[in-house]
A protein has these predicted regions:
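N-terminal membrane topogenic signal
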Residues: 4-22
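Short, highly charged, low-complexity non-transmembrane loops/tails of multi-pass membrane proteins
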Residues: 201-226
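Membrane-interface helix caps and helix-loop-helix hairpins in membrane proteins
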Residues: 33-41, 62-65, 88-98
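Membrane-interface helix-boundary motifs at transmembrane edges
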Residues: 9, 38, 58-71, 125-131
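Alpha-helical transmembrane segments of multi-pass membrane proteins
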Residues: 53-57, 78-86, 111, 115, ...
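Cytoplasmic-side transmembrane-helix entry/capping segments in multi-pass membrane proteins
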Residues: 44-48, 66-78, 100-103
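Membrane-interfacial alpha-helical segments at the cytosolic side of multi-pass membrane proteins
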Residues: 105-122, 159-165, 184-197
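Interfacial helix-loop-helix junctions of multi-pass membrane proteins
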Residues: 89-99, 144-188, 192
Length: 226
């Protein structure tokens, strides 16, 4: 099990480096472009995006954390779609439907993080079939809560950046409601990961969750039947 975990993390490390390299190259190019254009808003957003792959490794240096490369791939991959592509390239504005795709994926993304959090909080941290219902309910409710908080954040930030982030002028409350609906759909799409994990079945995402728990809490996280 330990060798298998190490092999998965080595492969994930190579994938992460590829994602991070392309991420940084795009952000640097955008910083130069927006500096030439004197576009202060997009320049600041691009600089902020460039800081993320620098900050992420620093988080793992906290004494109670151990780096999980497969989790890094998930985090940076989602941030890349939402931040450099969505906000810096401005696909949220230029590509119809991109905003809804991002919100759908955010539901899946947050659900997986919530599933990891569930097993981190669970006494003993063991992964077993008895967790199916509670773990799944936890990830669903956590994801929906984050979706609501995100919309509150957009509402608060709109006055600061001077942009109609929720498209209230054009859609009223429809855009915010649709965002939360598609986020919930993305959450539902992640339910099979929780079920497969509880049953001890392997998969890219279920392995990522299991590896994260195992690296932090040890072999007691092996799937246990009841």
């Amino acid at each position: 099990m330990k060798i298998e975990l190490q092999n998965r993390q080595q492969r994930a490390r190579a994938v992460y480096r590829g994602i991070a390299s392309f991420y940084c190259l795009l952000c640097i190019s955008l910083v130069i472009l927006y500096a030439i254009r004197h576009d202060a808003y997009h320049l600041s957003v691009s600089l902020g995006a460039l800081a993320f792959p620098i900050a992420l490794p620093l988080v793992w240096k906290l004494p109670f954390l151990k780096r999980v490369w497969s989790l890094d791939c998930l985090i940076l991959g989602f941030v890349f779609l939402a931040y450099p592509l969505g906000s810096c390239v401005d696909l949220f504005y230029w590509l119809p439907g991109y905003d809804k795709v991002a919100h759908t994926l955010s539901g899946t993304f947050v659900s997986l993080l919530a599933l990891i959090l569930y097993y981190c909080l669970k006494p003993g941290h063991a992964i077993g079939r008895r967790d199916k219902a509670l773990a799944t309910a936890f990830m669903i409710l956590a994801s929906i809560a984050v979706a609501g908080l995100w919309e509150i954040g957009e509402y608060a930030l709109a006055g600061v950046v001077g942009r109609d982030l929720q498209r209230v002028a054009a859609t009223g409350v429809a855009d915010s409601m649709q965002d939360m609906i598609v986020c919930t759909l993305g959450t539902i799409a992640a339910i099979p990961v929780s079920l497969r994990l509880s049953d001890g079945k392997k998969g890219v995402l279920s392995n990522m969750v299991k590896d994260t728990i195992c690296l932090h809490f040890g072999e007691q996280t092996e799937t246990q039947g009841v």
